[in-house]
Amino acid sequence: MFYNYKHFFSIVLQDVVSADYKFVCIDIGAYGKQSDSGIFGFSKLSEQLERGALKAKCEKVLPDSDISVPYVLVGDGGYPLKPYLMRPYPLRNLTQEQETFNKRLSHARQVVECAFGIISNKWRILMKAIEVTPERAGNIVKYICLLHNIILDKEGMSEINGNSTESGNCHNRFVWGANTSSTRATDVREKFKAYFANNP
């Protein structure tokens, strides 16, 4: 059940990463063959967001505008569009504004990739097979995410990047199932699109 499409056994780490590269929510232990959107759809985080338990309905006015939007998570095209979860527009027949939105969303998603690169380069155990039970492997990954956050709190980004030549230039980046989406989710994405188009 942990056998993935790359033909090896794995568990999945699905996370929420803040703009300062910290892991603020992690879900570990899903089967390696499951899709990201499927894992997210059955996660406790998704359940809480659907209920509004994590203040997903709080709104903020975007800088230098009168556009008010809720706080959102950023996902790739495999995730569903939700009022609290932005995904790119499908890649066919995009307007210039939609292309701009997709580029800005992709740029925001790079923070997650950077955080993964940082922990993989600092804790090399993540770059190879961990020969323990899936439960213990999940605990190892949890502790690594926790240690990563502690180091960021105590030493800052320079300590993280100082020991990692492959993590890329993380300082210049920022964050942040069925693909049917609600009218509210589409409205939120349209607001971000309009804002990005007018604030390059």
Language-model regions, residue ranges each:
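Short, polybasic Lys/Arg-rich linear motifs in disordered N-terminal/cytosolic regions
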Residues: 1-200
